[in-house]
Amino acid sequence: MMAIDKPLDFLWFIPSSGDGQYLGSDDLSRPADPGYFREIAKAADRLGYSGVLIPTGAACEESFILAADLAAHTERLKFLVAIRPGTASPAYYARLAATLDRVSNGRLLINIVVGGSAQELAGDGIFLPHDERYDHAGEFFQVFNSLVETGKANLDGKYIKAIDARLGLPPVQEPRPPLYFGGSSDAAIAFSGGITDKYLTWGEPPAQVAEKIAKVRKAAAAQGKHVTFGIRLHFIVRETDEEAWAAADRLISKLSDETIAAAQEVFAKSSDSVGQARMVALHQGRRDKLEVSPNLWAGIGLVRTGAGTALVGSPKTIAERLREYQALGIDTVIASGYPHLEEAYRVSELLFPEIGLPGPHGQIRSSFGERRVFGGGGHGGNVKIASAS
């Protein structure tokens, strides 16, 4: 166990394929809308989140272009943007990354997504077997890292060949923007230990997270590297535990058994991801055993690929669960909640004070020092409270 000596680094999420209030239902859904994404990013920027994750995939907006747009509408927010090796050359991605880091004044974080759906990868023109994708990614980032760190690269590899590759303009961050990565297979863990700066795990029970952290630390040490750790979780936080569990039930209240079965069939047929298999194993497609660890709820994974668990509870309860993960070595949380605009406020307003994170940035004072309470926003303003004598 590790001593907890500083607050968590907390990022939010841009739902770039769309959003909604119910899983598995079109009721009160929100389409992929750039204006809505800007609202979420601006809220996260003000509410105290350090950054946002922008996902990648066939159903999502292109992550680099969306990040460039959001950077123009925010001041301090960082952008965790995906690179999928094989969809373009490492030299091209190096130019994208350096330029985005420059135009955002050093606000780029890079998320390495090797891919877990053979069907989607085939659509991108990638046909490598599972483990070979990590060998390919290793060569890809040899070239990428050399370019963004030194401006030049050469490699005569099995998968990647680069002859006198050049990058004319460096990124703002030195030696380069940080590399994040998540994967649960042996090949993924070996790759992470040698390449990445921060290893990300999906929200599994603490004992399973501890096992993965130990494996990554061992792989990193064998290669003379140091890796830090983060966790990807959804959040359902309310003032009381009872309200939070009611909100979790509401989120899947329009989800039919037929929709669950169809989603699970797609996961089984299209994915060779070990991490996805671990997510499915937590709930086994059943909605009657979704609390897989204290306050860790697997309901989202019934129909959502990728991160499928949420911490559910009051601020105090969730803070206790987060401290358990921190004690294992987790220092970063990539969070989300449905719908993402409203839940960004709930997590910031309810949970952040409990875990020692500051409130909104740039908050304007609401009085000359007298205590006031919200009075409904009428013409008379908020209600003054006489100080005790």
Curated annotation (Swiss-Prot):
CDD domains: Alkanesulfonate_monoxygenase
EC numbers on record: 1.14.14.5
Any GO BP annotation: alkanesulfonate catabolic process
Superkingdom of origin organism: Bacteria
Residues making up the signal peptide according to the UniProt record: none
Keyword Ribonucleoprotein annotated: no
GO MF: alkanesulfonate monooxygenase activity
Pfam families for this protein: Bac_luciferase (PF00296)
Reaction(s) catalysed by this chain's protein: an alkanesulfonate + FMNH2 + O2 = an aldehyde + FMN + sulfite + H2O + 2 H(+)
Keywords attached to this entry: Flavoprotein, FMN, Monooxygenase, Oxidoreductase, Plasmid
NCBIfam families: alk_sulf_monoox, PRK00719.1
Family: Belongs to the SsuD family.
Described purpose of this protein according to its UniProt entry: Catalyzes the desulfonation of aliphatic sulfonates.
Name this polypeptide is given: Alkanesulfonate monooxygenase
Source species: Rhizobium etli (strain CIAT 652)
